[in-house]
């Protein structure tokens, strides 16, 4: 299924909201920008329901050759980490970790959403033209095996490459930056 803008938003929220511990659902997310508040709330609720959530985020320290201050991902990660949600940072060295992947799976079924959309209001609420693909099927299908292998190898730094670092490497508990992020997300005065 091809999804654009608001349809991506709706599908992502449905994916997260439908994940449950009784089905032994796992939710793996790799994302360049994460800032949209309803998605953050849904992730918190999924974690509290016992869904096994893992996230790989860009540390937002570099963008297009310029240094950044970590907003929004470090502030969002601080919120989610406080609930015990496992987070790793892409180990970037001037480049960006530009993946945008959400994979929900259990032993029987899987769902994959990937494409151009960051999880931000700008990307999901009809401000940018975005296109994602959504695939639903049996968990054993090759597309889900490939997506899972990509996430697991990035998470675990396998294949002889250091791809991610622990949350503590870029943790930022600054209240000033947190409230700056919240203002930027609310007002739209941001590049994310």
Language-model segment annotations:
Residues 20-26, 33-192:
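PLD/PLD-like phosphodiesterase catalytic module centered on the HKD motif
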Residues 11-15, 38:
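Well-ordered alpha-helical segments embedded in enzymatic catalytic cores
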Residues 1-12:
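Active-site cores of enzymes that catalyze phosphoryl transfer or operate on phosphate-rich substrates
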């Amino acid at each position: 299924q091809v999804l654009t803008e608001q349809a991506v938003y709706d599908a992502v929220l449905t994916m997260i909201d439908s994940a449950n511990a009784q089905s032994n659902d796992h939710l793996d997310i790799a994302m360049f920008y994460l800032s949209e508040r309803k998605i953050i709330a849904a992730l918190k609720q999924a974690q509290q329901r016992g869904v096994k959530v893992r996230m790989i985020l860009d540390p937002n320290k570099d963008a297009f050759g310029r240094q950044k201050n970590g907003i929004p991902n470090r502030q969002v990660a601080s919120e989610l980490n406080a609930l015990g949600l496992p987070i790793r940072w892409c180990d970037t060295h001037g480049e960006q970790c530009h993946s945008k992947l959400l994979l929900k799976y259990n032993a029987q079924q899987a769902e994959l959403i990937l494409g151009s959309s960051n999880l931000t209001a700008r990307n999901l609420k009809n401000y940018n033209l975005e296109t994602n693909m959504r695939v639903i099927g049996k968990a054993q299908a090759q597309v889900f095996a490939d997506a899972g292998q990509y996430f697991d190898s990035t998470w675990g730094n396998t294949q002889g490459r250091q791809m991610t670092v622990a949350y503590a490497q870029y943790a930022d508990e600054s209240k000033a930056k947190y409230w700056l992020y919240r203002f930027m997300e609310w007002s739209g005065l941001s590049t994310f």
